[in-house]
Regions:
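ATP-dependent carboxylate-amine ligase
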Residues: 2-148
Length: 148
């Protein structure tokens, strides 16, 4: 897990239910008086069973969620998002922004003083697979660019 800007923005590779739960719990312990916002998605053409579980965990441990693309590969981003939504408590604030760069920029530029942000799922990765294209993408660079 990597921390940017004091304790406000965190980046982690968490891409399984247990890892997402652990990352959210860790950040909550570092930001006990803050609300917690999380950005995440799930990989396409991979374990579909974990999607609703990750949605449930996020809705139980975070105060708001932005769902976005991870590596959708050949799968429809909307289909992946629908699977995640099946586990989410409808009472929580949810945004769906499939473009990961836009999702990160939106979250970073609208982050309030009383919030912490977890950008989960890609961590150290430097590419994103969409369809048959492998694009250059890095969560940390996207977050830092949003701060400029």
């Amino acid at each position: 897990m990597e921390k940017l800007i004091n304790n406000d923005i965190w980046i982690d590779y968490a891409h399984t239910p247990d890892a997402l739960s652990n990352a959210l719990d860790t950040i909550k312990s570092h930001c006990p008086k803050s609300k917690l916002r999380v950005i995440f998605g799930c990989g396409g053409d991979r374990d579909k069973d974990k999607r609703a579980k990750m949605g449930k965990i996020a809705s139980e441990l975070a105060d708001s969620i932005i769902l976005t693309n991870d590596n959708p590969r050949s799968e429809s981003p909307e289909s992946i998002t629908d699977d995640i939504l099946n586990g989410i408590n409808s009472e929580i604030d949810i945004q769906i922004i499939h473009d990961r760069g836009v999702a990160i920029k939106t979250a970073v530029t609208t982050l309030r003083e009383d919030e912490c942000l977890l950008i989960a799922g890609k961590g150290h990765e430097t590419t994103q697979t969409i369809g048959n294209k492998i694009l250059t993408f890095n969560d940390k660079k996207a977050a830092l660019n949003a701060l400029i």
